[in-house]
Each structure stands twice: as C-alpha cells, then as structure tokens.
Amino acid sequence: MLRALRGAADLLSTALYKNEMMMSRRYLSTPAPEPAKPSSEETTESTEPATSVEDAGEPMKEKRITQPYSSEALTKLKLDQYPLYVEREWWKTGKRMTFWASWRQLRDVKRREQIQEVGADRMRLKAIKFNTILPQAIRDEAAEKMQKARKYDHPRLILNMCQFTGRQRGKIKPYRLSRHLFRRFADRSALSGVQRAMW
C-alpha cells in the first residue's frame, strides 16, 4: 500500500514539475500584421454583402503572435533596436525582483504615491477647516470631506524607511539610510559630502 502511494506521489510530483516548467517559459507577443485591404475594383465585383465584426455585435479582438523569449524573437519584433528596452508597467510601479528590502517598504511606497495624489487638496481642506474667518458651514463641509478621506491619506503614516535594510527607526534623513549603514559607508568614504571625523 505504501509503495503504491509513494509511486503515485512520485508521478504527481513529476507531472507538477513539468507543468511548472511549461508555465515558467516566457513568451513575447505582438499584434498580428493587418491583412491587405482589397482594391476598389474587387469590392465592386463582389455582390455578397460583407458583414463586419462590429455589425455582428461581437467585440473585436486583436490577433497576437506569441513567440518564445529568445534573441531571434527580440530581433524579429525589433526590441533590440532603439529604444533598447521596453518599459513595462510593473517596472514603473517598482515591482522589480529583489528591489525592496521588505514588504513594508513597498507598502510605504504605495502610501507615498497616494499622498502625492491628494496631499495638496488635503492641505487646502485643513486650512479651510481651521480658518476662523470663514463661515461655519464652509468649515464644517471641509471637516466632513477630511473625515471621509481614505485611510492612508495622512502624511504621518509615511515612514521613509532605510532604503537598504527597511529599518524604520534611527534614520539619517538626507541620505535615507539607517544610522548603522550610514556609519559603515562613511567609514569607507562611500558617501558624498561625508568625511570621517578626525581630532
């Protein structure tokens, strides 16, 4: 019984491994070239009414050519020419492999982006709320808008962690480093404008 179970487990693990290998293979895709449009003479000769995809009520989908990730595919799709790289959305948002020291750092980045969106409006609403010259109705409306704001719109929730370690406390703010790394880099002259104290 145990041998049969062990054999089944081996078969299952090899099947899963092959499936993972197939899924891990990366592909490049590009829209298929558009077919050549028929000339005006050919269209007048044909008597059959041509129904387009839009008339049929079905959504029109682009056909994409999928190729394995290789140097030939890069050359064929002209991705090795200027610009030399394709900037992708996941790269813009900072989701690069091993880029953030910890998941807390990525959370901090998201909060910074959120405050960048609403920071100016929040500052104006706060000024209206605490302005004693304005009528009370306007001040109450500003206070209500601030109350209904999203959870992480408050700038005090931004931690500005150390960029190397993700440490939240003991930071040297202009260099965005924790005190331990600041001292280590300063000792070997790896920070611009910092010299080891000598007396």
UniProtKB/Swiss-Prot annotation:
It holds the Pfam family Ribosomal_S14. One of its GO terms (cellular component) is mitochondrial small ribosomal subunit. Keywords: Mitochondrion, Ribonucleoprotein, Ribosomal protein. Its main location: mitochondrion. It is found in: Mitochondrion. GO terms for molecular function: structural constituent of ribosome. Residues 28-67 are annotated as: Disordered. PANTHER family: 30S RIBOSOMAL PROTEIN S14, SMALL RIBOSOMAL SUBUNIT PROTEIN US14M. Belongs to the universal ribosomal protein uS14 family. Component of the mitochondrial ribosome small subunit (28S) which comprises a 12S rRNA and about 30 distinct proteins. Interacts with LIAT1. This is Small ribosomal subunit protein uS14m. It comes from Caenorhabditis elegans. The lineage of its organism: Eukaryota, Metazoa, Ecdysozoa, Nematoda, Chromadorea. The gene is mrps-14.
